[in-house]
Amino acid sequence: ARNKREGCTRCLDLCPTGAITPGIGPLKDQVLISAEICAGCGACAAVCPTGAATYALPPTQALLRRLRRLLLTYAEAGGAAPVVLFHDETHGEALIEALARHGDGLPARVLPLRVNEVSSLDLAVFAGAFAWGAAAVRLLAPAKRGHGVDGVLRNIDYAEAVLAGLGLAGPAPRAALLETDDPFSLGEALAALPRMAFGFAPARFEALGSPREMAQQGFRALREAASARVVVVALPEKAPFGLARVEQSGCTLCLACTSVCPTSAFTANPDQPELRFLEDSCVQCGLCAATCPEKVITLEPRLNFAPEAAAPQVVKAEEPAACPRCNKLFGTKASIARVKAKLSAHWMFADPARQALLDLCEDCRVLEATNGGIDPYAGAARPVTKTTEDYLREAERAKRGES
């Protein structure tokens, strides 16, 4: 960030070729993607919580439309417990063709869907697949794991955590990565999958909105259909959803968090000292916690299905501080008390008259300092210089037992 605090580094941490670098100079609050170095794995798009990095081959919304039509058509034709198999062209398609030519082919309920890179699948794809009726999702990858799959493995963990929290976990993982170069091993793994149907009708919502909005909509549809009415589901670290918890007793309403939040999850009330938080917009980047001067913000990755998560909630509100001279409203009482406590040990504010200046607004403070004869450049009072006679006099008094 521009304040030299570190926030979200998901794409920087996962890029296998180092194509993503933090900006410098005028671009220091951005990240730079070098098209010449990028290998096209899509790991950055898979984990980006804001949609700043997206994969265009195909776009997520186009992929979700294909996925929705595939699953709903299968359900309308009488199919049950479908398994979606995502694969690429170079490795996956050849493996499926070999299985069809030399073996029994894919099981009837396995629906293959080709993508450019399986490592580019973001969380919205998993949420949409399960909401639209998929009983399981499998990603086909080479046996020798590539460097770009760490991002999609995170999304698999997040999807599994949500399903487990909603009581929808199956006897086998519903989302997993199949790493094999053997077509017969692929066929055996898919045939061995148990039929893990959810037991409720697939959702019918359209694939509209950003990937983040689609992920939230998909998980909400699953929660509405699930028998367990869970409100909050805990998620692993670095999940794209969560709460930024503020310790109210230590918050001074300085509003530093509102100026750095990239998604406006933290906002201020322009009419009075008030801090608001919108949980659905929080991407757990950590900039607020790193910037908070009081260190009272902590991150809690979770998925909150309560209606309050979709509306700004008041985190803390205080009465504004009024200038005792002109009654102008400025700052908050807590922030002024905090400043006075920090400056109480400073020599410039040892005098109570100096401390009283902090209770005034910016205009009255200048007038009081000018009319009161306060010299802002005056140093602390110098101690009286002690001479040799002073030391000898003290020694004589000590001999006589005088204090």
Where are these regions (language model features)?
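Short tyrosine-centred short linear motifs in exposed loops/low-complexity segments
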Residues: 42, 255, 285-286
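Ferredoxin-type iron-sulfur electron-transfer modules and their immediate structural context
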Residues: 1-14, 18, 81-94, 149-151, ...
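Short strand-loop junctions, especially beta-strand C-caps/beta-turns
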Residues: 115-116, 142-143, 249, 280
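Cofactor-cradling patches in redox/metallo enzymes
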Residues: 125-182
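Flanking helices and flexible, charged tails adjoining ferredoxin-like Fe-S electron-transfer domains
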Residues: 1-7, 36-133, 140, 294-403
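Accessory beta->alpha helical hairpin/"wing" motif in late/C-terminal subdomains of nucleic-acid enzymes
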Residues: 32-33, 276-278
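Beta-propeller domains
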Residues: 6-12, 17-41, 50-51
